[in-house]
């Protein structure tokens, strides 16, 4: 466990400042790590590889708590693997973020009174590159602040030349394999961004709308349909009913007049229609609804588009030129004037899709676009998990993954933007269509032009695990570091990004999945569990907390909340608590160094060690084993808790405190404990380093004289256990804890000394008598000693003389008042829980809260009564 090639005894008596100031060391330490190349990856190394990619943040972005959370987990994994002897590669980079970046630069142009069309495509793209050079590197500096151990020399951007070649290569391969095609289909159209967006980029929310029922046809041949989008009725080409619906069988096959027009449309029978919903009849607008489009395909209905790309009505007549919402009101008014409105419901709350970027209401629109045929790709992505080639943590997330990949529709990959990877297809003057690979010659001559669309951002980021390693070239890095060892990412982009990487990785890399493991984490929320958002007023800039408390404090807080696949609540007071933990580590190490703690030489033989020494070494090895197992299972919260409680409770609060009497006594025992304490701190600091790298680097190098804990050996469980010593110290802890609790109950100050008679019933406690007296602030009994309280505790009896130390009368009066309050609380809570009418109406969380109040009242009553029973009569 203690082997460490970087460890040397300090050259001289080490000194640490009295207080830890993160701002004084973090920047310097990080730059030193980078300069020494600790984070770089060598493709020629004989070490086993450990590879993980950064989920590439948008070039428009800055570090938010979600990034900080994710990066903390990845960095912890990578730092541990580096210490374990792996050739580690944490691949950094950024995403070009097509829509988001174009929107940002367009807003900048707007401030100058210009649009992208004023510049033209080439000049606009050049302007975006200029913006990226000036503003796009903000997040890199923030990653350094957090301590991200990425291989900066390998930083990539999804629009880099090499990655662009990868995009062109896989597009050509998919096209040649007939897995990419161009077709006119219904897509999600954003009238603000003026581009198609994918299903997973549509955010649904409940909006107040209207539900209008209107009558189609004339005379006896009429039928009532209901819609929330009356403006689309101008493009209706049929009314559909279920073939088994007896109400409408006489109309199937007939044509009826479409109101407000001179057109007649057929009534068709289709099993898609639910006869139990509404009137059992639906209007069919194939050019403006995905389900209607499918009905139209089955019945050979024409597609009539009624809106342009700005969602403005184009059909000639009184509604031409109106925005869709204006047209909706005007059309309903016109129908009402004709007496065709049967019913109107306002407001009618229903789920409406919005663009995730600009929040504009999405318009389903028939459009010619490029598509990926995902069937065979999605099947391979599902099979890789089913067959165990890729594992998902936590396992219960597999169902969500399968639900997605097993039900994927073909993916619309074209976007009507200027910023992005332009589709590598050229059109000739005579209808020729040529897909051009990176090694192909571009068609030239009069009449040839390239497709104006660009690819969906997720197309290029789907290649990230292998394009960043040089693919399609067969590079040393690709051979060494593919597939990735693990992907750490949020469950919220399981479908956006993870599934696409799986599909493309398996396809491009001959069936080899892009990673062995997918470790999913939750979303960061505020301390009340609410989503963080600027609009909610609860968004936090992590740099503010890092400035105030240090990067280690933020990292430890985030790791301690990271249960697999579960959302993470976080509040500033929790970060402050983690800062206190860093200070505790600092102060304990400083005390140890001032009292002779050392890593020099071998550990003293077991027979020279005290029970306290053997106990802490036993617990140390058990903690190493526990932390290792939890790391391997991606249980960051549990391993952080294990480290916290071992370091704070067992090392600092118990071992260091118990050792103080040994150090004060001097001699050989003090030397032995000094070496044991040095060992424990050395290993503990190495265990903590992946999560809190800065404070551990400062302390470990001071303690050991080693070059850097970044490249130190990861601790290994030696197998040493001493159950007898553990039991002995547990008994000792019980004695001290029980008497401390009694002292606190009696209102004694922590440092207040009390005359006491200490009788050790357990002989194993005899060597600890001095420590017991010191920690409990017990002073020897004098001639006038009179025991006013006797405490029989595990292995010992402690008689205390409290006369003159507390006012017995006042204390009994205070406790009696507290007891009465607790009994009143119990009665009130019990009455509510005994009220059946209340229980029937109250929400579960309210009932649970009252049950908690009752349980606490019971605990308080028992505790206060015990204090009164132990207290002498006045």
From Swiss-Prot:
Gene behind this chain? Answer: valS
Q: Which reaction does it catalyse?
A: tRNA(Val) + L-valine + ATP = L-valyl-tRNA(Val) + AMP + diphosphate
**Where in this chain does the entry annotate a coiled-coil region?**
806-871
Residue ranges crossing the lipid bilayer per the database entry:
none
Q: Where is this motif: 'HIGH' region?
A: 57-67
EC number(s) in its UniProt entry?
A: 6.1.1.9
Per UniProt, subcellular location reads as: Cytoplasm
**Biased composition regions of type Polar residues, renumbered to the chain:** 1-10
Function summary: Catalyzes the attachment of valine to tRNA(Val). As ValRS can inadvertently accommodate and process structurally similar amino acids such as threonine, to avoid such errors, it has a 'posttransfer' editing activity that hydrolyzes mischarged Thr-tRNA(Val) in a tRNA-dependent manner.
Q: What species was this sequence derived from?
A: Streptomyces avermitilis (strain ATCC 31267 / DSM 46492 / JCM 5070 / NBRC 14893 / NCIMB 12804 / NRRL 8165 / MA-4680)
Please report the name of this protein according to its UniProt entry. Answer: Valine--tRNA ligase
NCBIfam families the record matches: PRK05729.1 (NF004349), valS (TIGR00422)
The alphabetized UniProt keywords are:
Aminoacyl-tRNA synthetase, ATP-binding, Coiled coil, Cytoplasm, Ligase, Nucleotide-binding, Protein biosynthesis
Query: Could you tell me which PROSITE patterns the record lists for this protein?
Result: AA_TRNA_LIGASE_I (PS00178)
